[in-house]
Design a protein with these regions (language model features):
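Short coil turns that delineate tetratricopeptide repeat
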Residues: 18, 52-54, 88
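Start-of-helix register in tetratricopeptide repeats
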Residues: 22, 55-58, 92
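Canonical tetratricopeptide repeat
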Residues: 26, 60-62, 96
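Register position in tetratricopeptide repeats
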Residues: 33, 69, 102-103
Length: 103
């Protein structure tokens, strides 16, 4: 897909409609696909700022992955430990934590 176009559509939506956790998550995923990890991180974090959104678990996990791609393994591990306290049954996160412990 054309991630540049998708990113511009999502940014345009946000500028007109205001904050939306689902759109921030999709924007972050587009930025990850473009290897724009700092932009992805900013999108995931913006989504997390929206109170009561239904994507908090997804946004938190994606934030951790963005930190990994930025090679900030220490911050990723701190966030992963907090994530697993909130979502202890997430098997993908448990495997990811094992990966982080080797960094």
């Amino acid at each position: 897909g054309d991630y540049n176009y998708a990113s511009s559509v999502y940014n345009n939506y946000l500028s007109k409609q205001g904050p939306n956790a689902e759109i921030y998550n999709e924007l972050g995923l587009c930025e990850m696909a473009k290897k724009e990890y700092q932009n992805a991180l900013a999108a995931f974090q913006a989504g997390k700022q929206i109170e009561g959104n239904s994507l908090m678990q997804t946004l938190c996990f994606n934030e951790i992955v963005a930190y990994e791609y930025l090679e900030d393994y220490q911050q990723a591990e701190v966030l992963m430990n907090a994530y697993l306290q909130n979502y202890p049954d997430d098997q993908t996160a448990i495997r990811e934590q094992q990966f982080l412990s080797t960094r």
